[in-house]
Amino acid sequence: VGMSIATLLSQHHDVIAVDVVKEKVDMINARRSPIQDEYIEQFLTEKQLRLRATLDARSAYREADIVVIAAPTNYDTERNHFDTSHVEEVIDLVVETNPDALMVIKSTIPVGYTRELYLRYARRFQQEERTAGCTHRKFRLLFSPEFLRESKALYDNLYPSRIIVGYPKFLKGEAFTEENKRIACVMSDHAEDDARLFAQLLKEGAMSDDVAVLFMGMKEAEAVKLFANTYLALRV
């Protein structure tokens, strides 16, 4: 996921790919694909991509306007849950080094996860500033599910069936009143604009002219991804 998005976006924008494996970083900087994907290999050798790779996550995030998070979230059968620890490590570092950056999760995550992250950071900001009210700090996070096939990831980004971007929305009902207030404290005043910006970046890199773009709440976007995975698994 990460390599295909990096390749797609680097057609028109400066992109820094971050990895913890030196061999992969060296391969990307030598214009060789670290994964088996015919289109990525072709683009690396034939296109003038604005792409470089680094092991220094802190430095990369400090310079970024947008951080796309494609960390692994392997399913933990013992806990019966996705392991989101790597995603959270990235978010923690971005918030520390560049709190104004827009973050977009591309990893597969549980339904309700991004909403819980908003609540978690709202509480953290309140605790750090020792207040029960809103702080001046904002948390800019979106979720954009991917629908990619193995070894065809870049092709599926170049010719996407649809683009979906989830951004924070308030849930209806008295049970969610307090949660909505906390999320309102930290969410960007331009969350929908952020979602439209990221969707436009994906469209800009695609080769399809007529791509369906859908905007929805983060929880709905998470559900769409998991339902799509379930459908494909049952369609063997």
Short names for language-model regions:
Residues 13, 63-64, 160-161:
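Short, well-ordered alpha-helix to beta-strand connector turns
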Residues 120-144, 148-236:
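Internal alpha-helical scaffold of NAD(P)-dependent oxidoreductase catalytic cores
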Residues 65-75, 159:
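Gly-rich Lys/Arg/Thr-decorated short loops/hinges at beta-loop-alpha junctions or inter-strand turns
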Residues 71-73, 108, 168-169:
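Short glycine-/small-residue-rich Rossmann-like dinucleotide-binding loops
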Residues 67-69, 105, 165:
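Redox-cofactor binding/interface segments in oxidoreductases and associated redox assembly factors
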Residues 75-150:
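Rossmann-like NAD(P)(H) cofactor-binding subdomain of soluble oxidoreductases
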Residues 39-65, 95, 134:
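A structured beta-alpha segment of the ubiquitous adenosine-cofactor-binding alpha/beta core
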Residues 1-31:
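NAD(P)+-binding Rossmann beta1-loop-alpha1 motif at the extreme N-terminus of oxidoreductases
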